[in-house]
């Protein structure tokens, strides 16, 4: 374990950090486990507010799972948790951390992460070539090549600029190399995340499907929906458009037998047609929360208003 550490002192530091964070999590109800991957749109800053709105139940579906912080931190309320995201590499990255031993995950982190631009570019090219192959050949999701896709994406997420996912128009990963390296605190974050996944493993399922594939959920299922933003052209939104918003609004309104918790950000007070449609139907209570968000040390802090809708 921790074979890549230089000496026992480093090992001790990592363990102390992980234990300290774990104690904080157990002892303080307002402390939540942070994802080691600050994925764009991550709802970690809002977990305390979302915790107030997401009711306990049998099954939680995190329909647009992203970083996974909502489903994993809310798992204590449910017997079953479904993580779903349309982006397959992201799902397989999470599945690898869920299925593989901690030693394997950390060794992969050591082998694949790099702040050396040439090594990073080599990994990025290898990832883009492999993802193109598995999609072209329609490999089954149990194929080992999908597992490797997940780990290569893992390495890119650890190393890319600000951990922000960016794709070109052909779907290739094109974010630049960052200046981060695999620090002891980052290893501790990965360790804590993995330990939490191990704890809730019997509850977890992972899918990469369109939201429309969840047509047959049992009555009373709690569904958390934080879709990509159609009002952005960012490369991480997976081609989500205003038409996608319209389809999701229709799906939600046709499935009000579920308990919906919906969130979306509003910059400068603007909302999407999706939010307006749900509010207009009269079937949701609405909360607006102001919070600050900073994507990186170099970016200015932005004031964002988060809209939370909860079905009545």
Regions found by a protein language model. Name each.
Residues 59-125:
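SAM cofactor-binding core of SAM-dependent methyltransferases
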Residues 79, 198-204, 282-284:
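A short helix-to-beta-strand connector/capping loop
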